[in-house]
Each structure stands twice: as structure tokens, then as C-alpha cells.
Amino acid sequence: MNENKCTDKINNLPKAIFIMGQTAVGKTKIAEILKKKLPVEIISVDSGCIYKGMNIGTDKPNVKKSSSDKYHLIDICEPNDYYSVENFRLDALKIMEKISKKGLIPLLVGGSMFYFKSLLHGLSNLPSYNIENKNLLKKKINEIGWYKSYIFLKKIDPIFASNIHPNDHYRLTRALEIYFSSGNIPTNLFKAKTKKLEYNIRQFSIMISDKKILYKKIKDRFFNMLKNGFKKEVEFLKNKKQINKNMPSMRCIGYKQMLAYLSGEINYKEMILFTISATNKLAKKQSTWLKKWKNINYIYNKDVYISSEEIFNILKKDNFID
């Protein structure tokens, strides 16, 4: 296929806009500003915002009842539910199709990079989550211990085992679950991908290049969360929703540390230090991902209104919008 035919094929595909970036850089605000200018509906790409009642610690948008202000994939699960990247991909694809059929453009915004990657490049055909199998596996792991479980994984799939830490109990459990459910090792299954995303996409990365400025934003944001009642939010989840540290929702930064504090595992000062440190590490990890990302426009954010204008102008220049 020559270049012109390839371009024509892409231009005939339904459109989508991706806004990703480091944590605390103003992605959501930029998306909200763009929504006032563009024929879009917003889809959240955030592994924390899917959970009901987890509002302050995820810096969740203030979702109004009006359908015109609707965010998709926000408040769709209880904190004790299991929601995987596979679930996200299926849900996001269905919503993107519905938005496109309305003649609108899906605008996906968030910082969960693996979610974005799953949309763009597909996922391996892994066995679906099964609570009964998981409980049986947990029972077996409790009998033999985490170390022996890791040694077993290393024996059956040394490649996958070499890419995870022995103390990464979540990924270790998932790897063993895949093996016992399918009879195949994770490394082999990860080679087979589902279909890639057939959309004409414009991707934007919102970045803050000055680490001191970014880390100050992260620190200030967390202290605002504490001021706005984050402790009470997690207390409610702990007491009323019976959440515990082993649930996927409690892997979210801030919730994990606050729950540890409320359970008496760490003190208040440690909770603050550990949360800010973990968020800084996340921002660094996101930056590493994004620097390697293909076909992306980097927007260095000093002001959300200026950044949204930059994005709008790029879309206009590319004839992506009328």
C-alpha cells in the first residue's frame, strides 16, 4: 500500500483524541476546556476513578448529573470489585463506538499508561478472572508461602519471573492463575495480541519538564486532599465497605498508605512521606513511558488554558477538526 492510500485509509477511520501525561499536571482540566470547543465526549482512563466512593484521593472530576457533562468510566465499580485492564479495554471500545456513531469524537484522558497501551496495541488472549480459581490458588500459596510460589513460577516461566519482583504478590498471583487456568505459561500467551485499535488518533502528552515544579504540585495536591477530608473518605471505605489492603482498589497511591496508617502499620508522618514519594515515582515512571511513546505531541504545560489552546491549534492545523 502506497503512502497516499495509507493516509486515505487512516482519514476514513473514526476519530479519537488521547490526552495522557504525568500525574498532577492538569490533564482533566485541559480536557474539560477542550470539551467546550470540540464535539467530544470524555472517557476517563484512570484505574482509580472507576471506583465509587474513591473521590478525593483520585482527584476525581466533579461529575454532574447532566448528560452533557457526563464522564464515561467513572464510578462504575465498588471498591471491593475486581476490574482489570481487559475489562477496561472492552468497556472503552464499546463507549468509543457509541460516541463515534453520534458523530462525536471520543476524548480519552488519564494517566493509566497501560490502559492506553492496551487500547492502541491490543492485549494478550489471557484467561478471564475467576474468583473460585483465585481463592483456590490463594489457599495453595498460603500453604507453601510466597517464596516457594515464586520459585515455582521461575521454574515454569523464567522469562516472566525475571521481570517481576518476588514480593510483587499481585503479579505473581496473576501469573500463576494464568498458568493453572490455561495450562500455558504467561510469556507464551503475551505473544498473541488482540486486534489493534482502528481509529484515526491524535495523541498528546501533558508534561512538566521542571521536576521541582512537578514535585511541588504533587505535594500541594496531596495536602489539599488531606484538607478536603481524605482521611475520612478512607475511614468510611474501611469501616462501611470492608475494604482491605489486598483489594486492587487499595493499590491506588494514597489509599494504600492511608489504609496502612488507619490499620496502625505506619504513623501519620510516614503516611504523608510514603504517599508523596510513591506519587513522585509514578510521575517519573509515566515520564519514562511517554518519552518512548510513538506518534505523540508533547505539550509542556505552564497553564492549562495555554496548553488546551496548543492542542486545539494542532488539531486545526492537521485538519482533524473543522
UniProtKB/Swiss-Prot annotation:
<keyword id="KW-0808">Transferase</keyword>
<dbReference type="GO" id="GO:0005524">
    <property type="term" value="F:ATP binding"/>
</dbReference>
<comment type="similarity">
    <text>Belongs to the IPP transferase family.</text>
</comment>
<dbReference type="GO" id="GO:0052381">
    <property type="term" value="F:tRNA dimethylallyltransferase activity"/>
</dbReference>
<dbReference type="GO" id="GO:0006400">
    <property type="term" value="P:tRNA modification"/>
</dbReference>
<feature type="binding site">
    <location>
        <begin position="21"/>
        <end position="28"/>
    </location>
    <ligand>
        <name>ATP</name>
    </ligand>
</feature>
<feature type="site" description="Interaction with substrate tRNA">
    <location>
        <position position="112"/>
    </location>
</feature>
<keyword id="KW-0547">Nucleotide-binding</keyword>
<keyword id="KW-0460">Magnesium</keyword>
<dbReference type="Pfam" id="PF01715">
    <property type="entry name" value="IPPT"/>
</dbReference>
<protein>
    <recommendedName>
        <fullName>tRNA dimethylallyltransferase</fullName>
        <ecNumber>2.5.1.75</ecNumber>
    </recommendedName>
</protein>
<dbReference type="InterPro" id="IPR039657">
    <property type="entry name" value="Dimethylallyltransferase"/>
</dbReference>
<keyword id="KW-0067">ATP-binding</keyword>
<feature type="region of interest" description="Interaction with substrate tRNA">
    <location>
        <begin position="46"/>
        <end position="49"/>
    </location>
</feature>
<comment type="subunit">
    <text>Monomer.</text>
</comment>
<dbReference type="InterPro" id="IPR018022">
    <property type="entry name" value="IPT"/>
</dbReference>
<comment type="function">
    <text>Catalyzes the transfer of a dimethylallyl group onto the adenine at position 37 in tRNAs that read codons beginning with uridine, leading to the formation of N6-(dimethylallyl)adenosine (i(6)A).</text>
</comment>
<dbReference type="InterPro" id="IPR027417">
    <property type="entry name" value="P-loop_NTPase"/>
</dbReference>
<feature type="binding site">
    <location>
        <begin position="23"/>
        <end position="28"/>
    </location>
    <ligand>
        <name>substrate</name>
    </ligand>
</feature>
<keyword id="KW-0819">tRNA processing</keyword>
